[in-house]
Amino acid sequence: VYLYGEEHANEKMIEQELEHWEELYAAGARDLFLEDGYASAQLLNQWMQAEDDTLLNEHFKAVQGTMGGSEVYRTFYKQIKQNCPETVFHGTDIEHMYRSLGYQYLTYLTAEGKKDSPEYAQALESIQQAKRYYSYSYAGKEAEADVYRENCMAENFMRELDALDAEKNTDVMGIYGAVHTALDGMNYEDGTVPCMANQLYQKYGERIVSKDLRISLKDLPEETTPVMGEKTLTIAGKTYTAIYLGEEDIAAWAGEAAGRRFWRVEDCLLY
């Protein structure tokens, strides 16, 4: 599970995400997790099979006024459709666009006679999650809203991943705001619950790999260009396997240092 933490609508980061997805896709991956609601992602999956861009245009009409409405995302999706046509999107956020895309998807399923389907039930749950989140937010309970959403994102991700695991053994990739992807991070608003990636790491361990794209590659020495997964290191004349755990942006307090990268060295005892 490769997680990439972005600054939303940052063109350079989105270009990196596309490159990473194309690499994983070429290696056989097909499942891309997004910071979107379930219904929103399902409608994007329908667009992937469509001959025109009607559904994509409806998506961007719905999300106008948000960071997700940036044209850089439209380009991102169109390049995925062109270069990685078998991509399947998985939306694991609450359904922020429940008044538009959420009910649009429910209406579609109803017309198809699928009101009793698992897809309908999951879309409805995502909508209900959003309603509860905004009930907290509109009441001025921002901390409660943030905690609730973070837990929903983790639970929804686990549900989708576990369902995939039951069908096939495959790598997946996820694109989320960087506040959700630190393996040791806490929720943004009040830091009282583990963030999404932290919760995933607690359940799946080193299967979860995370990179914060806010740490610009140009600011890192060439030899530290990220390597996903694992590599070998020589320590005291012996070769060991090191597992990549993720990165942390430390620029705010470390002066010229942009970030630090964490590796776990297997079976290495130093005396």
Residue ranges and their predicted role:
Residues 1-271:
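Compositional signal for N-terminal targeting/processing segments
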